[in-house]
């Protein structure tokens, strides 16, 4: 036997098969020196990626030099009686906020909608607990708003909870920066020109509100789209629908829960809420396999079908629904079955706050969840007629 083979055999027999802590050997069985041994990397704890920082501050771009901005300022100076020189001084302090531009861009196509995932974000223990406290702290204002405007307390609680978690997340953008940016530099998108016109109207409303209330317009903080306060009113809605519900002579949607409560109720009453409609805004529904009801979908944000028409098309409510007008609402769940609901005019009044079935349904469900939790009642996973 060759000497090398003999040595190898002796080494292998002397160091039997191996404990896990034995030093590594080469192909002949010789122990490798430390410098040649593979270093075992220590496992590192997974590092959480930090969310990208949002630039709330923006940058100066000399808005006052932009031709369209100058024309806009000329118009509102004439129309609303603003001092043109003061407008120039103000606009020269406004910053361009790219974060607002990025945040208004539509979501990439192809990702399926998922109501169950969305609702878990909006109807959670944090919002529920905060909603109970908000209701308890403001029961008098909620009762008064329900009596005056006909909007149930749970719907008001649902909206303020979905919008800002009862004032916790009201926005960190300077409203004047965000709205000016979107009014004159909206990203490429369908109806870009119409969206810019909308935000120019909101910019005018911001300046009118600031003048009327004696507020420095640069001090207003809100969302990336310029929405303000606990209920996230756009400036034009603030001008039209906000109310001084605490009676102190000023409207403060940021710091006065009473003003926020009364203003939400006033908005819904002005957008079609009907106090005389019995029952909840939605009723769970089943649909027939023949899909004769397809033509009832996507008929606008309005209730237009009677129970008989729905039944004839194969749509049945899980619990008896009053004789009212309804729309058929579909809540998609990705790869899971779609949920179907009959929605009356009050549901569609909520969509005037935010034109989304998911939004309106989350308002209804959060309000219901808070009401039941507050009363100590058991909360089922499905509203099924509320």
Where are these regions (language model features)?
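Surface-exposed patches in mature extracellular/periplasmic domains of secreted proteins
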Residues: 82-91, 151-158, 217-222, 248-251, ...
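Flexible, glycine-rich surface segments
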Residues: 213-326, 334-335
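C-terminal soluble interaction/assembly domains
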Residues: 286-386
């Amino acid at each position: 036997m060759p000497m090398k083979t003999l040595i190898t055999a002796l080494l292998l027999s002397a160091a039997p098969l191996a404990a896990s802590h034995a030093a590594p050997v080469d192909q002949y069985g010789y122990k490798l020196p430390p410098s040649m041994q593979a270093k075992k990397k220590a496992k590192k704890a997974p590092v959480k990626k930090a969310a990208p920082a949002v630039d709330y501050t923006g940058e100066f771009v000399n808005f006052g030099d932009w031709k369209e901005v100058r024309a806009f300022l000329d118009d509102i100076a004439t129309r609303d009686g603003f001092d043109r020189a003061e407008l120039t001084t103000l606009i020269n302090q406004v910053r361009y906020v790219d974060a607002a531009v990025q945040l208004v861009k539509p979501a990439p196509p192809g990702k399926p909608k998922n109501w169950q995932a969305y609702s878990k974000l909006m109807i959670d223990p944090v919002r529920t607990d905060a909603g109970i406290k908000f209701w308890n702290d403001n029961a008098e204002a909620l009762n008064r708003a329900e009596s005056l405007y006909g909007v149930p307390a749970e719907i008001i609680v649902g909206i303020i909870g979905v919008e800002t978690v009862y004032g916790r997340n009201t926005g960190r953008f300077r409203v004047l920066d965000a709205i000016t940016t979107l009014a004159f530099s909206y990203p490429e998108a369908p109806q870009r020109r119409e969206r810019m016109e909308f935000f120019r109207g909101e910019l005018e409303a911001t300046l009118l509100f600031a003048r009327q209330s004696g507020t420095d317009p640069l001090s207003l903080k809100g969302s990336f789209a310029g929405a303000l306060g606990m209920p996230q009113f756009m400036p034009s809605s603030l001008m039209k629908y906000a109310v001084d519900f605490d009676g102190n002579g000023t409207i403060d949607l940021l710091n006065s829960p009473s003003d926020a409560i009364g203003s939400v109720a006033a908005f819904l009453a002005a957008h079609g809420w009907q106090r005389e409609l019995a029952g909840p805004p939605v009723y769970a529904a089943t649909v027939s396999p023949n899909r004769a009801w397809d033509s009832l979908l996507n008929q606008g944000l309005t209730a237009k079908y009677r129970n008989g028409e729905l039944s004839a098309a194969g749509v049945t409510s899980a619990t008896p629904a009053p004789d009212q007008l309804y729309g058929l609402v579909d809540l998609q769940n990705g790869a899971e079955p779609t949920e179907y609901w009959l929605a009356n005019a009050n549901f569609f009044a909520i969509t005037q706050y935010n034109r989304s079935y998911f939004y309106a349904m989350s308002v209804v469900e959060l309000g219901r969840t808070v009401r039941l939790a507050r009363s100590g009642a058991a909360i089922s996973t499905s509203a099924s007629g509320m």
